[in-house]
Amino acid sequence: MAPVEVKGLWHRYRSANADWTLQGIDLCLQPGELVGLLGPSGCGKTTLLRLIAGFEVPSLGEVRMHGQSVATAQRWLPPERRGVGMVFQDYALFPHLTAWDNTCFGLRRGQDTSRAAWLLELLGLERLTKRYPHELSGGQRQRLALARALAPAPAVVLLDEPFSNLDVEVRLRLRSELPAVLNRCGTSGVLVTHDPGEALAICDRVAVMQDGVLHQCASPRTLVDAPASPFVGRFVLQANLLPVQRHGSDRWTCLLGALQRSKIPSPRVEGGDAEAGGLPPAASDDPVLLVDPAAIELSPDQQGDACVMGREFLGREWLYRVEAGGQQLRLRLPLHHDYRRGTRCSLALRSGEDVLLFPDRIGLTLAAQPLQ
């Protein structure tokens, strides 16, 4: 039975003329699964987490846990009766309690503390049990917050951007350990993050949100291979969105050249309608191409209609910003492609690369013959 199931969830805060913060969210968390809620600031992911936790009452829809209804607009079960653990980005530890007392805080009086001791050892804190939060590093405090959340053996732990206040090395180490810790504890998890790399790296599935709408909930591989909307491709992959013109039944043109239908089957959205989350209709019926930054090749050309506007060094490659056709594109190129700002150039789709056409959701590739 699903630890968490969200059905038709709508929510808005009680202020004058408030817009909907969540719009028709459907989501199901499977046992032992870690699901990421991914999206830009203000998209509603933390609100959704708070509704699951019981800190907010939904305006419409329902939250169910293990088949039991815990929240509707008329009926609401308080957080302490839902059997969930919470981990916040600011740790929320009790400053006057030691690491041991913080870990045991959620246990019932007289409850066995052996699990708390096991968790502290699992998280590498067994020698720090007598220290207070101010005597711990940021990474140690977040480990302690996780131990406290897991000590009562919740079926679900909810994590609200738990790594955002940590330095890079500690953040990478902790996030890589999280799935194994949850697995050892037999606990499912919901992770809020605005970092696509973080969500793709550790989550079993990722729910991509924008303006209160769930665009797609799928495995990381499916999000990369078959994004359900231009927004998913843009936010998750940092892909380029290009206008495209259709010519007849099987030819298209864009600023990267002439295109034809790819021989690769059209990608299938994973999850089906039950996980679509009320995906809104496209803002326009105009076709648009989703193009990976690594799928575009650049050639210096004094007569070219594109211009290098800037670049960022990414260690093993450059990320170029190129203006073409009145818009800015992102290109990922190897380090030997050394072009300065102001360089005139021509752009083309790399041979053998595929791009995704919306709203049709079919794959296109470079045409074998130029359009006549």
Residue ranges and their predicted role:
Residues G83-G85, Q89, L93, T98-F231:
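ABC ATPase nucleotide-binding domains
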Residues S249-E312, H337-Q372:
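Glycine/charge-rich catalytic "coupling/switch" loops of P-loop NTPases
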Residues M1-V6, H11-G24, A73-L77:
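A short, flexible loop at the N-terminus of ABC-type nucleotide-binding domains that lies
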Residues A53:
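Helix-to-loop junction immediately C-terminal to a conserved catalytic motif
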Residues L38-P40:
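The feature captures the beta-strand-to-loop junction immediately N-terminal to the Walker
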Residues S59-E62, D211:
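Conserved coupling/switch loops of ABC nucleotide-binding domains, chiefly the family-specific signature
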Residues G61-T72:
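Conserved ABC transporter NBD signature motif
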